[in-house]
Regions:
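Outer-membrane beta-barrel initiation region
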Residues: 22-125, 161
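Outer-membrane beta-barrel "beta-signal"
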Residues: 82, 374-383, 388, 406-422
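Residues that define the transmembrane beta-barrel architecture of outer-membrane proteins
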Residues: 74-78, 105-109, 147-151, 197-203, ...
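Outer-membrane beta-barrel translocator/channel fold
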Residues: 128-151, 157-158, 162, 176-188, ...
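Transmembrane beta-barrel strands of outer-membrane/channel proteins
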Residues: 63-67, 96-100, 126-132, 169-177, ...
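C-terminal outer-membrane beta-barrel translocator/porin domains of Gram-negative envelope proteins
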Residues: 182-325, 331-357
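Residue-level signature of outer-membrane beta-barrel architecture
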Residues: 84-86, 115-117, 157-159, 207-213, ...
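Repeated loop/turn-to-beta-strand initiation elements of outer-membrane beta-barrel proteins
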Residues: 59-61, 87-94, 118-126, 161-167, ...
């Protein structure tokens, strides 16, 4: 216990130094909405069977390079993560993760720790992160640069277990700060102080579940539903594009389902969405673009400059194993947003569209695409992947020059990626 206490003190010291020395950020810069959303894993189609325990690898890691970045911060993105497992023999994991984009557009660093806490199956996790960005490539006039940091804690406790259904509840809290500087403000004058300087605090109450069924053949489903309540303090903001100050609340949901059709074919469905109970700040809003959303669109696409209060994205992937090491898939992505909560309830709300610089005349609209992908496992733990995405229909939220959020207007997109696990 004394050793564990020393480790926690050491970890807290690292967290503090990280926040002090390396900031990371947004405001209305590059999208980091998903930073606050820990993605759900791909579910297995059958319950795990207890096997003979195997030794825990003390150090594991991942290296990923792809072109899922953005025009504003650099398309090429690299991720490296290292985990130290069970080094105190308490079942704990310490993780270090860094993400960097080409052109020094974005630098992100995250430290995390996860511990069992004595109650059967319960875990306590901490994360601290920081990001620094420069989006001058996209908007040289404003030359926006910024930084943000966050720290969060998450407690999860199982309360129901069976062969086909497992339920857990979770309580978490996050505190994040955002600072953005611009060479000029919206009105065209020099701000003199940070255009955005705000603090967000949020608490979440969540229900986690995973289940197995044979509705069609054999399938597994994982999910999470959360109620969030928080406060946004933007008292020091001079020229914020991000949204209202004060308390806010919303409901979010994530569901992943993997349906085993045959020994070679799977249907993989992913859903995530949120419903705003109050108007939201930019850091809590929802967007439709990016590699894990409607893939043909850029990060932060949807809703103009501020993104949207409510929305959802659903992805369908039909997978087929061509050989033992090669998987092909066809996909369809659909996303829908509502930019303003309670839009139309006031004269002020009705005059909020179109958003300056955008042809966004609809408060609610959708984006969609389809495409093909290929994944090749060249050797154990080494994968190459590529996908082609094609835009379906028009973008109702495009800019006045008919380009997307990142000022491009492509109808087709090809992406490549490389992943090495060790």
């Amino acid at each position: 216990m004394r050793l564990l206490s020393k480790f926690l003190i050491f970890l807290f010291f690292i967290f503090t130094q990280t926040i002090t020395n390396l900031y990371a950020g947004i405001a209305s810069g590059p999208a980091v909405h998903d930073r606050n959303v820990i993605p759900l894993p791909r579910p297995p189609t059958e319950p795990k069977v207890d096997k003979v325990s195997v030794p825990i690898n003390p150090i594991t890691g991942i290296l990923r390079i792809d072109d899922s970045g953005s025009r504003s911060t650099g398309f090429t993105k690299g991720l490296i993560g290292i985990s130290f497992n069970d080094f105190l023999k308490k079942g704990e994991t310490l993780t270090i993760r860094e993400i960097h984009t080409s052109g020094n557009g974005t630098d992100y660093l995250e430290l995390g720790a996860k511990f069992p806490v004595g109650l059967e199956g319960s875990t306590l996790a901490f994360r601290v992160g920081a990001i620094k960005y420069d989006v001058g490539q996209q908007n040289a006039v404003a030359d926006a640069t910024g930084n943000s940091d966050f720290i969060d804690a998450n407690f999860i406790k199982p309360f129901y277990k069976s062969t086909d259904l497992n339920l857990s509840f979770g309580v978490s809290a996050i505190r994040a700060s955002y600072i953005e500087n611009r060479s000029i403000t919206i009105s065209g004058t020099a701000p003199g102080t940070p255009a955005t300087d705000k603090i967000n605090q949020r608490a979440d109450l969540s229900l986690y579940f995973n289940s197995y069924d044979k509705v069609f053949n054999q399938a597994g489903t994982t999910g999470k539903i959360s109620f969030s309540k928080g406060d946004n303090n933007a008292n020091h903001t001079k020229d914020d594009l991000g949204g209202p100050t004060g308390s806010f609340s919303k409901v979010t949901a994530q569901v992943n389902r993997l349906e085993k059709i045959t020994e070679q074919d799977n249907l993989y469905i992913r859903f995530k969405g949120q419903y705003a109970l109050t108007p939201l700040d930019a850091a809590e809003e929802f967007s439709l673009g990016g590699l894990y959303n409607v893939r043909v669109y850029p990060n932060s696409e949807g809703g103009g400059a501020d993104n949207a209060d409510s929305g959802f994205v659903i992805n369908f992937e039909l997978e087929r194993m061509l050989t033992k090491n090669i998987k092909a898939f066809a996909f369809y992505d659909f996303g829908k947003i509502s930019i303003y909560e309670n839009y139309g309830d006031s004269t002020e709300a009705k005059s909020s569209l179109p958003i300056s610089g955008f042809k966004t005349n609809k408060n609610t609209y959708n984006l969609k695409d389809s495409g093909l992908g290929l994944e090749w496992e060249a050797m154990p733990n080494t994968k190459f992947n590529m996908l082609w995405a094609h835009k379906l229909g028009n973008n109702p939220g495009r800019r006045t020059d008919n380009s997307d959020f990142d000022r491009t207007s492509t109808k087709d997109l090809i992406r490549f990626g490389f992943t090495q696990q060790f």
